[in-house]
């Protein structure tokens, strides 16, 4: 039925051009969005495989459809590798995304209207941690904690006071824009004081956790969620982990299926299995060490150029640049740096006076640039280029000069050679 003539190129010119243009953009731009990375050709191969054809409601060995014996192998591989990677007793690889993983955990542990606590979005949290525009803030009563306005660090004493006041049923420890180590033991202590479940969302730092460069929450949290992309460098998807607890495990399984989802995406699960196998290799730890070194180098260079970093530094792959004292908005900075072929994202900073559509900060991350092969030398050059642009976001001649340098560096370090 299908032969090699069935290609997008020969069928859909508009879509083919969009894909080709995106491939060129990835090669000709330096990616500094903290939540993005480049997957390996092996991951791409799995995700584009015939496993996309197979419907497989249920779990390995307990499917509602026949013909699942081979996709069962893929899912069992993903599960066993994730258990080994994170030291977890239970793993569910079926969530389509990190947000759906978080939603499944909440469905398993909470009832509509229950109170839970999460980090405020402007302070570095995530939409699913209680934002009023998200399901988490609509279906449940969310109480937000934040960072100290002077230090930029989580104020655990204030968090504890809020917990004692509101008696949440669940506390979420996690972030999308926080550059420091979370004190899992303190979170556990606070949760125990009020009889709350503790959920850790490690979507941003999962790769660092997997190799021991960031403390693991698995021994402390009742449930851990993550995405499988970002620092983990796998396909876009979600993952749920926990230590041994038969009651919670059963709740999580039924919450994911049939509670949240129908058929799992078996081609994505196969891609997760490949990514987890890659993450178990010694070179993955070397990569994560470089991610961390690059983030610290970027932080140091930008500080030397007069830019404020929220919390004063970084312990992971990201940093949050506070532009309030520079008199420019995150939106302006994002656009200007983008014109130099450096991709970043505007981001709110703690106590930001501007709206989330404008913001007063930039979030920068090093996972993708490190995958590309950048080390301290390249990151130093790159960080200075970012500062050059930010020094005058309206100087198009300077932006053009930086863009030329970016293109030369991109050719030296292709993504897919």
Swiss-Prot record:
InterPro entries: PyrdxlP-dep_Trfase, PyrdxlP-dep_Trfase_major, PyrdxlP-dep_Trfase_small, Ser_HO-MeTrfase, Ser_HO-MeTrfase-like, Ser_HO-MeTrfase_PLP_BS, SHMT-like_dom. The keyword Transcription regulation does not apply. It comes from Legionella pneumophila subsp. pneumophila (strain Philadelphia 1 / ATCC 33152 / DSM 7513). Belongs to the SHMT family. GO terms for cellular component: cytosol. It catalyses: (6R)-5,10-methylene-5,6,7,8-tetrahydrofolate + glycine + H2O = (6S)-5,6,7,8-tetrahydrofolate + L-serine. Its main location: cytoplasm. Keywords: Amino-acid biosynthesis, Cytoplasm, One-carbon metabolism, Pyridoxal phosphate, Transferase. NCBIfam families: PRK00011.1 (NF000586). It comes from the Bacteria. This is Serine hydroxymethyltransferase.
